[in-house]
């Protein structure tokens, strides 16, 4: 997975990420709605997951990760967030569209995005597009910039975790 983030001049961050998996769209969506897969993704970043709920093709879970030093004054040593991923029904070719939302607890920040799963010649492409904003006067943009490498790392971990998961399931 390759993730690119761009911090906008007037605040907010654009997130664009692409991954490719040697699997069908149905297999990829099944993986991405499995709490055990997300547990592995977050474990790779030093975090944990809890309170996972799956309803149809939607997943909601709580994530706890070590907080970057720039935000420990706001949240302490652990950053917790509610993560929700919801998929629409499959199209004729198996493609899926969905929404992703991550809301950190204890600070006025939010990530909202769109997810696409599409078949290609050799498997399935996963595309995320979205925004991340921190609504803290005077320091919000600085916090967004500090979050950029952590967001990039989080999306990139999904590629390795996905490859491993699909090889063993």
PLM feature segments, named:
Residues 18-22, 86-88, 116-118, 133:
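Generic structural detector for well-ordered beta-strands
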Residues 3-64:
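Hydrophobic ligand-binding cavity/cleft-lining segments
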Residues 46-54, 86-87, 112-119:
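Short amphipathic beta-strand and strand-loop transition segments with alternating hydrophobic
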Residues 84, 88-89, 140-169:
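A conserved amphipathic terminal alpha-helix motif
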Residues 51-101:
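Glycine-rich portal/gate segments that line the openings of hydrophobic small-molecule binding cavities
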Residues 39-45, 93-94, 107-109:
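Short secondary-structure junctions
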Residues 14-16, 78-84, 97, 109-114:
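Short, surface-exposed coil-to-beta transition loops
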Residues 95-149:
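Beta-strand/loop substructures that line and gate deep hydrophobic ligand-binding cavities in soluble
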